């Protein structure tokens, strides 16, 4: 399994629409950087957010998530409250090759401000926008800039294709658009 370079990412994105829209260079002046880098792709956060709130004194339950736990926000700058959390999505839409897994890590610009970004792996065959989890670990409000970089994606190509891809097993987040809240498959 090898880490894929910029040339591979560019070819997959331009020829197979692995990342759309795709930015061929790294954009970084006056913004939190995004676009193609040496061994990865810096994704952008869209202008749609779901900010966690405690106004209803609900318990967060991943098996029975109550949408009253979040407040929808759309704008160029999202303020994440102190010691709080927001969900967002990428500007980019991904179509993962059947032999490739992607891992996403937060950007140092935000990490150095106490903002932690968590994204689960992009499995082989996955398609959709990526839901991003943003934690403000500081005792102060934190700004998140829409349409700018939020995290870096690293692509790992397997030595061989897996037997069952995310799309083959009809993963519950397949083809997601927008910010997708937790889902649990119902027993039949």
Curated annotation (Swiss-Prot):
Pathway: Pyrimidine metabolism; dUMP biosynthesis; dUMP from dCTP (dUTP route): step 1/2. Its EC number is 3.5.4.13. It catalyses: dCTP + H2O + H(+) = dUTP + NH4(+). DCTP binds at residues 107-112, 152, 166, 176. It is an enzyme of class 3 (hydrolase). GO terms for molecular function: dCTP deaminase activity; nucleotide binding. Gene3D superfamilies: 2.70.40.10. Homotrimer. Belongs to the dCTP deaminase family. This is dCTP deaminase. The gene is dcd.
């Amino acid at each position: 399994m090898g880490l894929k370079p910029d040339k591979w990412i560019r070819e997959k994105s331009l020829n197979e629409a692995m990342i759309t829209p795709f930015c061929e260079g790294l954009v970084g002046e006056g913004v939190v950087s995004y676009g193609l880098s040496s061994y990865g792709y810096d994704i952008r956060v869209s202008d749609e957010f779901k900010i966690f709130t405690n106004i209803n004194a609900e318990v967060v339950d991943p098996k029975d998530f109550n949408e009253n736990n979040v407040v929808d926000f759309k704008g160029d700058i999202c303020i994440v409250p102190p010691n709080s959390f927001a969900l967002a999505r990428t500007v980019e839409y991904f179509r993962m090759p059947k032999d490739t897994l992607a891992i996403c890590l937060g950007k140092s610009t935000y990490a150095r401000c106490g903002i932690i970004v968590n994204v689960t792996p992009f499995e082989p065959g996955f398609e959709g926008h990526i839901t991003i989890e943003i934690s403000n670990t500081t005792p102060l409000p934190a700004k998140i800039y829409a349409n700018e970089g939020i995290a870096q994606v690293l692509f790992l190509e397997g030595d061989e294709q897996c037997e069952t891809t995310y799309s083959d097993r009809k993963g519950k987040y397949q083809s997601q658009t927008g910010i997708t809240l937790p889902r649990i498959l119902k027993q039949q």
